[in-house]
Amino acid sequence: MHNYFLRTLSRLLSLELVERSKESKRRLDEKPLTMLKIGVLGAGHLGKIHLNCLKQIEEYALVGFFDPAGDTAKAVEEETGIRAFASIDALIDAVDVVDIVTPTIRHFECASKALQKRKHVFIEKPIVATPDEANALKKLADEAGVKVQVGHVERFNPAFIAAESFIGEPLFIEAHRLALFNPRGTDVPVVLDLMVHDLDILLTIVKSPVSHISASGVSIVSPTPDITNVRIEFENGAVANLTASRLSMKNMRKTRIFQKGAYIAIDFLDKKTEIFRINDEVDETNPLSATITLADGSERQITFQMPEIHPINAIKTELESFYSAIVHNTTPAVTIDDGINVLKLAYRILDAVAESAAKVKK
């Protein structure tokens, strides 16, 4: 009896060890195969947000950051415990991936140094300061053969993600991006500071070349336009009306999309999406609907839907997506070409604003 008990206990222990081994292997298999070393260039407001997000992503090994302002670098190092490097080159040499969160005017300098050393580059929007810099950066990226992703973060906004599957062929798009005044960002026109977010969304959902642009803008407190409105016409007949202002009494980031049989409202700020659809058949049992009678006597039903919004940190998610693109050798979610196309459209708008201003002066 004693021997039987010992044999049974031994078998049970063996089975438990096997199961533990399987569980351990499963956990190992679930762990990322590659740990990428990453460093951040720029430790200002947005740079600190990136540092905080990267600390939460276990697939990245956050090596450190560089900021040319010594006092800022020291303060951030003491606050976060993340190493402050003494130079850009020292940081780039120590990492696999460079995350560029500097003022736009320094994007090209930082990105070109990283690409020349064949480092993967995540670069905040706008991609660089001018179209000429964008073309030069594209050439460097192609020569380096590495991944580049641009930080057009609204692609990762949960409200847009919830709306995306409902968007077909937009006919009219209206966007308002208004912000309280903040001196940060006034080194560039509001088109490059704020409107670029909506330009990226616009080029994502309208699959047609731009045919005509008319725009106007006003400089009130900074040397460049603080408020701009633009009408963009596409070759497929779609029209967009965009307004961006950094002198508003309240913050607003709303886009409305009108297409055949549907109207989609996206609130990027409050993370809400509303879908209104027109149905030919009337379902009187649907409580979230209203029936309308047209001039010819026919009836249509308008149904209302609010898709579920999955709360995510958009910046953290875009950085995670870049990791995935690198290790799986896939196309980044927001490519260098996407960033260049947005920048070139922004400059066409700036040219239209200047042309409009010249007419007013006459």
Language-model regions: role of each:
Residues 90, 97-100, 317-362:
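C-terminal helix-rich "cap/oligomerization" subdomain common to oxidoreductases
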Residues 128-185:
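A contiguous active-site-proximal alpha/beta segment in oxidoreductase catalytic domains
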Residues 199-278, 308-330:
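Contiguous beta-strand/loop segments that form the cofactor/metal-binding neighborhood of enzyme cores
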Residues 86, 123-124, 148-150, 174-175, ...:
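Hydrophobic residues in well-ordered beta-strands that form the structural core
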Residues 50, 80-138:
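Beta-loop-alpha module in the N-terminal Rossmann-like domain of NAD(P)-dependent dehydrogenases
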Residues 151-158, 181-212, 225-226, 339:
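Mid-domain beta-loop-alpha active-site segment that forms a flexible
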